[in-house]
C-alpha cells in the first residue's frame, strides 16, 4: 500500500535528550510537549488552524493523562482537534506516525499533529484495588522500573530483548561492536560544525522551563548524559 501522507520539510522537531533524573525530570511530559509544540509551531509560522486531527503517544502516564491528546492540543493552542492517545511500549512512536498517516490517507483529516512524549524519571507508583484480596488489600506497581524489568508476555526484562534477537539471528559480538562504532561515528558527525545537523530539527541552545512553565530553570547546549 502506498501512502499519500507527507511530513512537510522542516515541520518536525525534538527536544534534546536528557539523562535519567536529569534536566527534564521535574517536568510533566504532556505539559512540556505542549509547551515545546506551541513554540516550535510559532517559530515555523505554522498556522494552527490548519490542523484537524491529532495523535498522541506516551508509555508512562502522568497526572491528567486520562484526557490525552485533546488536553495537550488545547495547551498547545490547537483546541479544535481531537484524536487518540496511543501506548504500545517501544513501538509507540511508530504507531503514532502510522495512525496519523492512515487518517490523512483515508481522507478523514487533511493535516494531523503527530506528537509523542514521555518522562521515565520519577515514574508513578500505582495501586490496584482488589476487594477479594487478603483484608481487601490490592496489588501495586512501580510503572517504569517494574515494566522495564519484566515483559509479561515474554517473561523477561526489556534489556534481554536485544540479546534474544542477536541469538536468534546469529549476530555476534564483533558485528554488534561494528554497529556501536558506526552509531558513534554518526553521532559525532551530528555534533560537527556546532551541532549543525541537530539544529535542523532541534532548537539549541534549549531553554528548560521550571515546573510551572514561567521561568527558565536551565539551558542545554545539546543532549545531556551521552558519552562520546
Enumerate the language-model features and the residues they cover.
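Flexible glycine-/small-residue-enriched beta->alpha junction loops
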Residues: 111-164
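Short, well-ordered amphipathic alpha-helical segments that serve as non-catalytic structural scaffolds
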Residues: 29-45, 68-72, 96-99, 158-165, ...
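Active-site-proximal alpha-helical scaffold in enzymes
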Residues: 84-118, 166-196
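N-terminal extracellular/periplasmic Venus flytrap/periplasmic-binding protein-like
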Residues: 14-15, 26, 30, 34, ...
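Conserved catalytic cysteine-centered active-site region
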Residues: 58-111, 141, 152-157, 226-228
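Active-site pocket-shaping loop/turn-to-helix segments
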Residues: 14-38, 61, 84-98, 110, ...
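Condensing-enzyme catalytic core mediating Claisen C-C bond formation in acyl metabolism
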Residues: 1-27, 141, 167, 226-228
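Short acidic, glycine/serine/threonine-rich loops at helix termini
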Residues: 21-22, 66-67, 122-128
